[in-house]
């Protein structure tokens, strides 16, 4: 059962300075190992052997530990007090966990006192306390909706989560603040969190920047930037290179021309033309190259966070997919950089890696005994739950709100699959992963608008469909998922027991 405790205070070492002449003299004699009474010199003790870094990067909670993770939380109304079993069965998973994590996708504020422009997703002041009461301990904030209502919405959400006692990572007043790990001090130990976002090109204005001297930096997200590379055949790449040469061949007599790179100095299988990269690969797909500095500094933050905690979660909000033409709402395939990022994060000390952002579920992988969730889907999905002021601000081209703007199923082009998700319950014992249970959830695509997007236990036929999908997506990753009583079960350790009835 989840307990709550105040954050542990830091213990700051006290440094005593020897300020007097006598003190300095004594210090000098001791430092040189000289006994003034006998003239005997003392051997200085050998320095202690450096600690094995692996001990600091290991899972340090030996007691049984249950971590529950969910995907995106876009919430206007939590429904936490709804007594129907299909709701409470899901909420109980969150409450009973030792640690509960989700991605706080929308924004929160006290709307009566909010001074920013109202646009996009905004929940009222009672949402954060309700999420806390439901069991949320840690939330990611690095995502593409933090500036829906400009920077004011980011700061108001920070204030709301702080007041509710929910630790959060991924945004801040500058990049140092946004990239720093957050911590939750629970009964089983301290849990750290580093939150990242791989922004789309249009969203880089939300990227936080470093402070420099008296310049405070720009507020925003902890971004992991990247280059997109479109894959083409070798013949197509040669044609692109020829087109580039032709485009940059000036008429005779032209001065001050732009010089192309020396073809001999370029990679044979890759070229950039008009700001777009191309390389030889499978046509119709794209690859991603992470920014080296962003990757290095995020891994450093994960490593530092693990040094200061007993358990570490690394998380990334990612909308990218490998298939160029696939609509972003339905990208169930994993882009090539995500496994690299997840495994480097685990090698840097993360005990689990959680991806959110895809509006559908993806597969699960186990790497070195640590879980990687490549797509958790939508937990709360309440775009449509907006006050009239927010509606008019979100869709100014529509004038007055009507049925097509209020019903997100019409206005956003969503499908039932976007409302079929899961809750992951991960169990550790003696610092080792033992078992993962996947509980399917439904956002009630066929239900009334007032309850659309509220998470509830999926009915049996839908549960089987969701689990079969995750099972198929996980198989190429080397993960076997058993489906028992409408629950997906991944058994890792010998202590894992058969499922005895799901959410009862």
Kindly label every feature range from the protein language model.
Residues 13-25:
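Bacterial N-terminal signal peptides
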Residues 23-26, 30, 34-504:
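Acidic, metal/ion-coordinating pockets
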């Amino acid at each position: 059962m989840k307990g709550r405790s105040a954050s542990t205070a830091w213990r700051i070492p006290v440094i005593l300075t020897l300020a007097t002449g006598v003190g300095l003299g004594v210090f000098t004699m001791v430092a040189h190992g000289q006994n003034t009474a006998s003239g005997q010199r003392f051997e200085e003790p050998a320095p202690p052997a450096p600690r094995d870094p692996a001990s600091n990067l290991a899972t340090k909670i030996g007691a049984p530990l249950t971590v529950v993770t969910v995907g995106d939380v876009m919430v206007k109304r939590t429904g936490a007090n709804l007594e129907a079993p299909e709701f409470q069965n899901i909420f109980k998973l969150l409450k009973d966990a030792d640690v509960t994590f989700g991605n706080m996708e929308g924004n929160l504020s006290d709307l009566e006192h909010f001074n920013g422009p109202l646009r996009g997703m905004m929940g009222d002041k009672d949402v954060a306390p309700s999420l806390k009461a439901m069991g949320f301990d840690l939330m990611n904030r690095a995502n593409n909706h933090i500036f829906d209502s400009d920077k004011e919405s980011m700061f108001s959400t920070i204030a709301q989560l702080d007041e509710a006692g929910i630790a959060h990572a991924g945004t801040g007043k500058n990049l140092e603040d946004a990239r720093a790990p957050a911590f939750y001090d629970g009964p089983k130990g301290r849990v750290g969190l580093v939150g990242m976002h791989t922004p789309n090109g249009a969203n880089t204005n939300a990227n936080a920047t470093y402070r420099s001297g008296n310049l405070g930096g720009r507020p925003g997200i902890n971004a992991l930037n990247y280059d997109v590379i479109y894959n083409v055949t070798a013949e197509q790449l040669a044609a692109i290179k020829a087109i580039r040469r032709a485009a940059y061949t000036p008429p005779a007599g032209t001065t001050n021309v732009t010089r192309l790179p020396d073809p001999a100095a370029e990679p044979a299988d890759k070229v950039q033309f008009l700001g777009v990269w191309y390389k030889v690969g499978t046509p119709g797909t794209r690859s991603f190259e992470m920014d080296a500095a962003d990757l290095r500094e995020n891994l450093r933050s994960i490593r530092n966070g693990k040094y200061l905690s007993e358990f570490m979660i690394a998380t990334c909000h990612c909308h990218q997919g490998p298939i160029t033409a696939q609509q972003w709402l339905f990208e169930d395939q994993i882009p090539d950089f995500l496994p690299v990022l997840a495994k480097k994060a685990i090698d840097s000390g993360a005990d689990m890696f959680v991806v959110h952002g895809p509006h559908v579920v993806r597969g699960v992988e186990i790497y070195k005994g640590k879980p990687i969730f490549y797509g958790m889907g939508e937990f709360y999905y309440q775009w449509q739950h907006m006050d009239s002021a927010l509606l008019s601000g979100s869709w100014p081209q529509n004038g007055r709100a009507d049925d097509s703007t209020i019903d997100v199923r019409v206005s956003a082009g969503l499908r039932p699959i976007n409302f079929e998700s899961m809750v992951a319950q991960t169990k550790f014992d003696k610092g080792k992963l033992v078992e993962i249970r996947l509980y399917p959830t439904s956002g009630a695509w066929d239900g009334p608008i007032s309850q659309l997007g509220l998470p509830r236990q999926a009915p049996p036929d839908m549960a089987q469909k969701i689990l079969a999908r995750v099972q198929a997506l996980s198989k190429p990753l080397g993960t076997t998922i058993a489906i028992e009583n409408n629950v997906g079960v991944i058994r890792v350790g010998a202590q894992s027991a058969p499922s005895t009835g799901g959410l009862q």
